[in-house]
Amino acid sequence: MTSAPRPEAEELLLELPAVHASARAARGLVRHFAEQHGLEGADLDALILIADELMTNAVDHGGGGGALEEAQLERPVAMRVSVVLDGASWSVSVSDQGGGDPAVVDALLHPEGLPDLEDERGRGLYLMTLECDSVEVRRSDDALGLCLVARRVLGAR
């Protein structure tokens, strides 16, 4: 018995200023790309939510300083967004240019027990792990920051 051929993976790749206006525009591009490739329902909603969380973190903590618009950046800072759909799963990765220690972020992704509800930070990344099958952090390809990669199997939830 042979299995049906798996569709080729489709990728959306964006390099944008690390500002909230870019993240807002990218959300629309990610949604359009995913819908054009047949993603819908809970899988689409989760992709948009996770992409938004990763981009927002890149803007706020990955070198963008929380800038709303590009004019507010003290220096040019970019984020790189990749969305891959392969017919069985999606993945989204966001790389920033804000330095950082992968071990510190990994601890936020995989805390011992629930995150402290009194802490002002750290819950978003943890909550993101509940919607994904895996979330990883590593040094970005340009070594200027971090790259977070989230994956979800389609229809698994």
Description of each model-found segment:
Residues 1-13, 59-157:
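Conserved beta-strand-loop-beta-strand hairpin that lines the nucleotide-binding pocket
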Residues 1-49:
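Bergerat-fold GHKL ATPase/HATPase_c domain
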Residues 50-51, 144:
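Short secondary-structure capping/turn micro-motifs that flank functional sites
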Residues 53, 57:
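Conserved polar catalytic motif of the HATPase_c/GHKL fold
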